[in-house]
Amino acid sequence: MNNAPHLYFAWQQLVEKSQLMLRLATEEQWDELITSEMAYVNAVQEIAHLTEEVAPSTTMQEQLRPMLRLILDNESKVKQLLQIRMDELAKLVGQSSVQKSVLSAYGDQGGFVLAPQDNLF
């Protein structure tokens, strides 16, 4: 069975999904990125299934190589953008924790307002 056209089409679809994920990450559309990830994973599994059935010829491998490079480059860029986002979120969580600690320590002073006073001596 010659699945070369189907395999090539599956790789083209994977490239499109990869480019979509990169665009979503670049535009900081994180919810949409997460949603699109499942379609990407399914496309990768489809390609794995197709290549298990029949190994691609050397010619087909040469045709697919640029697509694979593009996909790997896109994936690397998406990972970098995700790491930046994770760092931003960690910073926000840290700030939130500090604010919570400050409020917890100083927020409840038994109804008294703490204010500097003049020295009475």
From Swiss-Prot:
* Region (Required for homodimerization) residue spans: 1-50
Tell me the Pfam families matching this sequence.
FliT
Keywords of this entry: Bacterial flagellum biogenesis, Chaperone, Cytoplasm, Repressor, Transcription, Transcription regulation
Listed under GO biological process in this entry are: bacterial-type flagellum organization; negative regulation of bacterial-type flagellum assembly; protein folding
Q: Give the principal location in a single coarse category.
A: cytoplasm
| Transmembrane region(s) | none
The protein's location, in the record's own words, is: Cytoplasm, Cytosol
Record's Gene Ontology CC terms? cytosol
Which protein family is it in? Belongs to the FliT family.
Subunit architecture = Homodimer. Interacts with FliD and FlhC.
Q: Which HAMAP family match?
A: FliT (MF_01180)
Tell me, what does this protein do in biology?
Answer: Dual-function protein that regulates the transcription of class 2 flagellar operons and that also acts as an export chaperone for the filament-capping protein FliD. As a transcriptional regulator, acts as an anti-FlhDC factor; it directly binds FlhC, thus inhibiting the binding of the FlhC/FlhD complex to class 2 promoters, resulting in decreased expression of class 2 flagellar operons. As a chaperone, effects FliD transition to the membrane by preventing its premature polymerization, and by directing it to the export apparatus.
> Any idea what this protein is called?
Flagellar protein FliT
Q: What is the lineage of its organism?
A: Bacteria, Pseudomonadati, Pseudomonadota, Gammaproteobacteria, Enterobacterales
Chain's gene name: fliT
